[in-house]
Amino acid sequence: MKETILEKIVKNKYEWIKFRKKKQPLITFKNHINTKTRNFYNSLKEKNPVFILECKKKSPSLGIIKKNFNLIDIAKIYNKYASAISVLTDEKYFDGKLEFINIVRERVSQPILCKDFFIDPFQIYLARYYNADAILLMLSILDDFQYQKLSKIAKELNMGILTEVNNTSELKRAIKLNANIIGINNRNLHDLSINLNRTRILSSLIPKNIIIISESGITKYKQIRYLSQFVNGFLIGSHLMSEKQLEIGVRSLILGENKICGLTRSCDIEIAEKYGAVYGGLIFAPSSLRKISKNTAKKIIFNNTLRNVGVFQNENIEIVKNIAEELNLYAVQLHGQEDQKYVKKLRQTLSINIQIWKAFSIDSKIPDLNWDHIHKYVLDSQFGGSNKCFNWSILKHQILENVILAGGINSNNCIKASKLNCSGLDLNSGIEVSPGIKDHKKIKSVFQKLRYY
């Protein structure tokens, strides 16, 4: 019978341990182990959901995930958003190293989970020697006796334990073995397929006093919103590592693809970035109370990390093109009576790297959302920037993954809005002091509610 990838990994791990014991005998470092750790369990008892964000260069299923694997840059970003940070240390199959732990740990305040295939006590001592605060114990590769032996050593070293299960049988064992943090792996460790339903099914069998973490296959904010009703948090690695812009990827996953529109000041852009917006809206429509000039836009967006979106209304295509390309906009949003013919011509004219979005003012029904050349749709109230919502009930049972919801969204209704499963929210008048002047406390309030629920 053909060896599974998990069997190959474990087989290699025995060989690695044998080699490492000769190279670095336990007796040479055991007395130098410090048992003062960052509390992994407490870090996962924060407001839900919690996030264990992972540093992973490679995986057996995907190969090289992140070519530019700069741990210092990754740590700097994860430090802003993670509850704990996972570091892959398996060498052969994940291109990891134990030395990675300290590179990350020295730059963050969170506990570090050493993610490896633990089968021998030597590995735990080694992980702690390299300053890991917690380890992963997989019941798919450990029997009860092995688990008890390894967990005893981890506890003696004040290390946290994430106990991973893959099926009902392993879950029952984890509960019997008194695991206080259980990770449900949505990936089949034998054929590497993903099934997110595993989290929903297995979580219902776990006592309430146990922290539950959903692992593998999480790629969308929508999934996090849904699965958060069953678990305390998520371990996410491959999806984030595959993002070209890691920080944007983290914000999108944890908070949704949210946009703050009607930006007129650089200080408001800084706050939008700080609290987790993905897009920044710059309005060039002459009729808007929040309109800005191209020169003002150039000044305020200098060196920011938002994906900037220019909002236009029935504008000459050449003007749209010139502004969009000179400001290097991520997208142009059409907020007038532009038709499919206009969009087609704009697409032929505009740089291929710049997306085209179409906004619709909603009355009582949803318009056609199948236009050619449109990446996203913005559904707004009849009068944009009026701090009024349209009837959201018409959105029920609709597929809204390429829709951004706008119109009167504020700290009082943002949670209700986020449950509609749009890709994100468009915040404008609901977070202002006056047109174009954003209220920083309101922005903070909205994003905190989108983060913890």
Swiss-Prot record:
Keyword Lyase: yes
The protein's annotated pathway: Amino-acid biosynthesis; L-tryptophan biosynthesis; L-tryptophan from chorismate: step 3/5; Amino-acid biosynthesis; L-tryptophan biosynthesis; L-tryptophan from chorismate: step 4/5
Pfam family, one: IGPS
Endpoints of the signal sequence: none
GO biological process, one term: L-tryptophan biosynthetic process
Cross-referenced InterPro entries: Aldolase_TIM, Indole-3-glycerol_P_synth, Indole-3-glycerol_P_synth_dom, Indole-3-GlycerolPSynthase_CS, PRAI_dom, RibuloseP-bd_barrel
Spans annotated as N-(5'-phosphoribosyl)anthranilate isomerase: 258-453
GO MF annotation terms: indole-3-glycerol-phosphate synthase activity; phosphoribosylanthranilate isomerase activity
Similarity remark: In the N-terminal section; belongs to the TrpC family.
NCBIfam families linked to this entry: PRK09427.1
Alphabetized HAMAP family for the sequence: IGPS_B (MF_00134_B), PRAI (MF_00135)
UniProt-recorded name of the protein: Tryptophan biosynthesis protein TrpCF
Species name: Buchnera aphidicola subsp. Diuraphis noxia
